[in-house]
Amino acid sequence: MSSKIILLILMFLSFISKNKSLGIATIVMLFISFFNTEKCITFMENHFMNLGMTFLMIWMLIPIIKNPEFTENIKNAFNLKGIVCFLCGAIVAVLASKGVGFLKGSTDTLTGIILGSIVGVSLLGGVPVGPLIASGIAYEVVFIINLIFKNNC
């Protein structure tokens, strides 16, 4: 029952913050929670991250087919701003890849990332791609802390 209350709170926050993605996600999950079908939940858990990444990648590739001059504009990407954007894109992609494994590592990691991402999305106007990046950054921070203090966080 507590999971339904949390979902209702999130749905309320999504409407207040006008975050359609969080609103739709909470409505879908609330609906599914009433049926408690383990097969459906397991399927979503196993496949939805990859499906979401695929849709995000499709969205990122739209300019290639939408803009006929895209290939000509590639040379313009090698100015200072373009190089900084290229490096940030590469770094974030690597951090996100570290985050995938880190999210699966433990429940305290997953809970903290989820709560932080929900606050970021619902109250601070963020977008819901944060969990992978946040967990990748968290992975690197924990790795550095472990190196410095010889600790096992």
From Swiss-Prot:
Domain of life: Bacteria
Keyword annotations: Cell membrane, Membrane, Transmembrane, Transmembrane helix
Any one Pfam family match given in the protein's UniProt record, by short name: DUF441
Transmembrane region(s): 5-25, 45-65, 83-103, 113-133
Main location: membrane
InterPro entries per record: UPF0756_TM
Annotated membrane topology: Multi-pass membrane protein
Keyword Isomerase on entry: no
Keyword GTP-binding belongs to the record: no
GO CC terms, sorted: plasma membrane
Subcellular location: Cell membrane
Family note: Belongs to the UPF0756 family.
Matching PANTHER family: UPF0756 MEMBRANE PROTEIN YEAL
Protein name: UPF0756 membrane protein NT01CX_1209
Species: Clostridium novyi (strain NT)
